[in-house]
């Protein structure tokens, strides 16, 4: 990437804040921090006909697939609610089928605006730093110890790992497939723009951030994306236990929105270190009985 510090020292446009840099393989984005990401489009089981035991089983199998990812990995799950557009044209071999479709088309047009949901699963992997990569090479025989991490080797490992995870997900998802280059750019464009259209892959797939950012972002108390107002809703605290499909009512809302959930993975050892650090910080905040009595008497 070109060093823009010679021309501009501060971020001025939306593209400056986007992480995407280039397409390095089919549907795989290289980010500015050296991480790789790829996205799959999926559709889960029908919640109206599925029994609770089936949904619990699906949630358990999904957890078993994602728990294989450790430190350096992040998973993003997004649901997009968008306009369904016009009724699709169809041809039928007989008059009876055409009449049934005509009645269905009339009901579709009388109902007014229609919305549908699309679901995306994004995997992101940030390789270890150069020093950690060199230390890892010393632990295995037959590896070149004179150079650092090979970018092609890291990319092949990322592709292999994500393919294995998606194969597990395909076993219980009715529809699940990786996005190609054009579908990936189209999806990323839909996350930062209100204009819904396909994005053609450029001849040199570089500077994806500037290619996709076609609307200005205005911050402040009343944020806007282009001419559209943006409102952000976040959940401060999740309950201790939930049931699968608890947010299914969001699929019936008659307006456009994006629901995004992120999970940052940690190895067991890294998670233990983090919990120990947090526990020590809380333990350091303890107060003696004398300090409590002093606060009560002075206040």
Describe the residue ranges of each PLM region.
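Extended, folded cores of ATP/NTP-driven motor/assembly subunits in large transport
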Residues: 1-299
